[in-house]
A protein has these predicted regions:
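Glycine-rich, highly charged phosphate/nucleotide-binding loops
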Residues: 80-99
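Short, Asp-centered acidic motifs that coordinate Mg2+ and/or phosphate
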Residues: 102
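Short, solvent-exposed polar/charged micro-motifs at secondary-structure junctions
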Residues: 76-82, 222, 310
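Cysteine-nucleophile active-site neighborhood
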Residues: 105-174
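Well-ordered alpha-helical segments embedded in enzymatic catalytic cores
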Residues: 90, 123, 284-287
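Amide-donor transfer/coupling interface in amidating biosynthetic enzymes
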Residues: 1-71, 95, 99, 165-167, ...
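Short beta-alpha junction loops
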Residues: 71-76, 144-145
Length: 310
């Protein structure tokens, strides 16, 4: 799938070197097709890494995708240059009158705080409420999934005794839903978090359908309102070295951290980490774009998006 990005976004050159089809703005204007409009609310500290990971994950269908990056106005990023944000990011006030085919809300390393203690919590809630009427399908990742469970259904998170950190085995529990079409019975996915939304509370919520879960990591994938809301408890978008970088970051800071589970061959951090989850990540995002973004966006919604976007 061609991903449309700003011409000089740093991730563009990296993706092209990986043989991923990235389309610049000039070429996209000369194609006779409507791209899917996907908004990404990027709450991760090093935003460039997440940009690359998500653009890579979105690049595996024949659909053209026009990505808009957004950051919260109420939080000052300490790990991403202001020049990068000013050039490549928008804010909610600038896009709130538009409609989008899809919205991705990323995770954030704030799970040790209560939701109300997060400085951009009110703004996040406003964006989630806005998405109810302005977005066809919203994909919530990791902390955003926990935040969504809390905001929509009142299900709070709980602290883990030890960080859930590594690559875990998951089982598909409902094959009738297109989001897991093409998944193996058992698949792997990374996790990196200190909290969890209790599996029993998710199971008890009648509005939620669980699609995949893990004995060690709990519920991984859930869906609501026929795909208008999708919740991913882990980080399938992570690249090969993300957990490695987090592990060494915490070691350098003197923080208590265990070797990532099921990640290094023989649990040896000197060895190259195994990449065991990429194909299912691609499958997940491809299914989301096809079945819940492209095929479910009503014609009237498309026209509204085109008119407002002019």
């Amino acid at each position: 799938m061609p991903i449309k990005t700003q011409n000089d976004l740093p991730a563009k050159e990296i993706l092209e070197n990986e043989n991923i089809f990235v389309m610049d703005e000039f070429r996209a204007l000369h194609q006779d097709m409507r791209p899917l409009q996907v908004l990404i609310l990027n709450n991760m500290p090093v935003k460039q890494d997440t940009e690359l990971q998500l653009l890579r994950a979105l690049s595996n269908t024949p659909l053209q995708v026009d990505v808009t990056f957004m950051n919260t106005k109420t939080h000052v990023s300490l790990n991403t240059p202001a020049s990068h944000l000013n050039k490549f990011y928008t804010t909610f006030d600038e896009i709130k009158d538009r409609t989008f085919d899809g919205l991705i809300v990323t995770g954030a390393p704030v799970e040790d705080n209560t939701y109300e203690e997060v400085d951009y919590w009110e703004e996040t809630c406003k964006i989630l409420d806005w998405a109810e009427t302005h977005v066809t399908s919203t994909l919530h990742i990791c902390w955003a999934a926990q935040a969504g469970f809390y905001h929509y259904y009142g299900i709070n998170k709980r602290q883990l005794t030890q960080k859930l950190f590594g690559v875990y085995e998951h089982k598909v529990s409902n094959r009738k839903i297109p989001l897991v079409r093409g998944f193996d019975d058992i698949f792997m996915a990374p996790h990196s978090r200190h909290t969890e939304t209790p599996s029993e509370a998710i199971h008890a919520c009648k509005d939620l359908t669980i699609l995949a879960e893990s004995e060690k990591a709990g519920v991984f994938l859930a869906i609501a309102e026929e795909g208008k809301k999708i919740f991913v408890a882990g980080h399938p978008e992570y690249d090969r070295y993300t957990l490695n970088n987090e592990y060494h970051r915490d070691l350098d800071k003197g923080l208590p951290i265990q070797i990532p589970y099921n990640y290094y061959p023989n649990d040896d951090p000197e060895q190259r980490p195994l990449l065991q989850w990429r194909s299912h990540c691609n499958n997940l995002y491809s299914n989301w774009l096809n079945y819940y973004v492209y095929q479910t966006t009503p014609y009237s919604f498309i026209n509204t998006a085109e008119i407002i976007g002019k």
